[in-house]
């Protein structure tokens, strides 16, 4: 089914029923006009309006307009705001399993991550961690593999990671710390100045088209690949549970349909624009590089250690980690048989 067909089916259900529209203010962790990430919230808002026949609309606010970007979860939990738009991995400090659900280092491709989350039991596990906070989790937007980041120093050996000051989100930060780096999480609006002034040596954020909007190519020398830390990543709509429970089951299902349609949009919208943007960066003097195999091997080994350590500390993390490993194991034979060698 196409996205329009999915949404149309939900809209037909709502047709002919006069209801009072409800508008939810949504605090985003991203700038409202940011390509792909901010854009995704607007696509979701349109899809929800169509699917519910106008019964529910979203009014999206950019990062910092309602609450600071990294306070969105606590604000939704408390009821200060009804809903938020986020990268799931931002909340790993409060919800350990969110680090894994947001992005797994050396983890699944986008299609397999979507499969695990929506059909492989992933969402049911992760939701259990959100329940004590009174928050409904709706993973509505998946990001394709990201670059490894922007650097102002070359990474030729594992030793070059020692003392590296890097902004990185999710579990990737813990992996780099294990190899001697010093990492921190900063919101998008602070990254340019931090990199320009040398407070950090490197940063990652998202896809090339998103990074372009943040101006990194103006101040960083090297653009490294691959994005080992986020082969795929999840962004979500989070809704205060009292607000969510205030919707009838029919409307909840329509919102879920709109959410899944937005996942389809995110998978379709990501691949094509990136190559042209990378060429723009090269024309500006940025050097694109791949991490050496030695460095990737060390990052993979450290990632496995971190994943196992986190699983030992948190039962829900352990449950999710076992679940995703089982899902990938079952899919491995199929995917390996279907893989076509590159020329």
Regions found by a protein language model. Name each.
Residues 15-21:
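Sec/Tat signal peptide C-region and signal peptidase I cleavage site
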Residues 8-9, 19:
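Cleavable N-terminal signal peptides
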Residues 1-7:
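Bacterial N-terminal signal peptides that target proteins for export
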Residues 21-113, 123-343:
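N-terminal secretory/targeting leader peptides
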């Amino acid at each position: 089914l196409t996205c329009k067909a999915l949404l149309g089916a939900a809209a037909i259900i709502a047709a002919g029923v006069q209801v009072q529209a409800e508008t939810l203010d949504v605090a985003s962790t991203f700038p409202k006009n940011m390509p792909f990430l901010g854009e995704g919230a607007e696509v979701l808002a349109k899809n929800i309006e169509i699917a519910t026949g106008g019964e529910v609309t979203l009014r999206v606010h950019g990062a910092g307009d309602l609450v600071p970007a990294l306070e969105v979860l606590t604000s939704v939990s408390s009821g200060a705001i009804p809903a938020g738009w986020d990268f799931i991995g931002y909340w790993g400090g409060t919800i350990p399993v969110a680090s894994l659900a947001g992005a797994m280092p050396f983890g699944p491709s986008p299609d397999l991550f979507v499969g695990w989350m929506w059909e492989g039991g992933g969402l049911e596990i992760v939701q259990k961690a959100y329940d004590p906070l009174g928050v409904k989790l709706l993973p509505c937007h998946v990001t394709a593999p990201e670059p490894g980041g922007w650097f102002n120093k070359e990474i030729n050996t594992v030793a070059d990671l020692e003392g590296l000051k890097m902004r990185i989100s999710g579990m990737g930060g813990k992996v780099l710390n294990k190899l001697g780096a010093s990492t921190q999480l900063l919101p998008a609006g602070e990254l340019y100045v931090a990199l320009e002034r040398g407070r950090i040596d490197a940063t990652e954020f998202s896809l090339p088209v998103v990074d372009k909007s943040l101006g990194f190519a103006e101040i960083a020398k090297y653009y490294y690949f691959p994005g080992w830390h986020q082969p795929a990543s999840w962004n979500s709509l989070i809704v205060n549970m009292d607000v969510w429970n205030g919707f009838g089951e029919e409307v909840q299902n329509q919102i879920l349909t709109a959410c899944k349609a937005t996942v389809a949009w995110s998978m379709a919208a990501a691949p094509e624009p990136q190559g042209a943007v990378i060429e723009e960066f090269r024309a500006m003097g940025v050097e694109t590089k791949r991490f050496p195999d030695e460095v990737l091997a060390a990052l993979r080994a450290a990632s496995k250690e971190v994943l196992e350590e986190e699983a030992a500390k948190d039962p829900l993390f352990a449950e999710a980690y076992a679940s995703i490993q089982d899902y990938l194991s079952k899919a491995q034979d199929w995917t390996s048989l279907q893989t076509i060698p590159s020329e």
